[in-house]
Amino acid sequence: MKMTSRKLSDILKQRLQHENRSFLFDREKDTLRVEDQTTKKGITLDLPPIIAKWELKKDEAIDEIVYYVSEAMTAMEGKAQEMTGKETRIYPVIRSTSFPDKSSEDIPLIYDDHTAETRIYYALDLGKTYRLIDQRMLEKENWTKERIRETAAFNLRSLPTVVKEDTVAGNYFYFFRANDGYDASRILNEAILNEYKQHAEGELAISVPHQDVLILADIRNESGYDILGQMSMSFFAGGTVPITALSFLYNEGKLEPVFILAKSRPKKD
């Protein structure tokens, strides 16, 4: 069966049906809007990326997006979330620079620039889902951005790490997958990066293709870059919350895109 935006829209409408929800399929923009009729809050889904995931994962891709939307809508329907008293549940999350900088209510989200490809947003963990922290939440509780930043960084460092190692063509790859929603966020833990940098025999390259994986690679020969690039693209295409297929090199505490450095690296005769 060939999946189209119309077919996908119909499937999602059926799976997400609720007495208080409305759906709006926009054929020109290839989007589906899911909205709570009482609060007028909702989520707009970009359908082509979901179709791409469906071609790889079939029904599993549908299950993932239904779960994500259901949890997010439930959170929206609940009472206003407060940060005070829940400080240990505030974490940084990595998103692409194309990710919206405002909430569905047009409230500016709190974020910091990270790289040319990524931003750091801040989230209040609600268990099965989370709420991105916005400017209104800060003002209501009289929090500063610096307090959010420091609290999130402290909590991130307290998270346990789950790492799997693989060796391909003489290059070593380390996959951080604790499946706690903050695997990609561990790119912000400099202690981890510095430890792997210290023990790397080659260049330390890093990839955050989607929210639920961080890849560190000890690149010991030129083929390692291509292998990491292929891995990153595969993870990027299959992720529920994709970030970037681009990889970075880590040197002197800084991240730089691999393709920029490759262009500037002189070729040997």
Swiss-Prot record:
This is UPF0354 protein YtpQ. The lineage of its organism: Bacteria, Bacillati, Bacillota, Bacilli, Bacillales. Belongs to the UPF0354 family. InterPro entries: DUF1444. It comes from Bacillus subtilis (strain 168). It holds the Pfam family DUF1444.
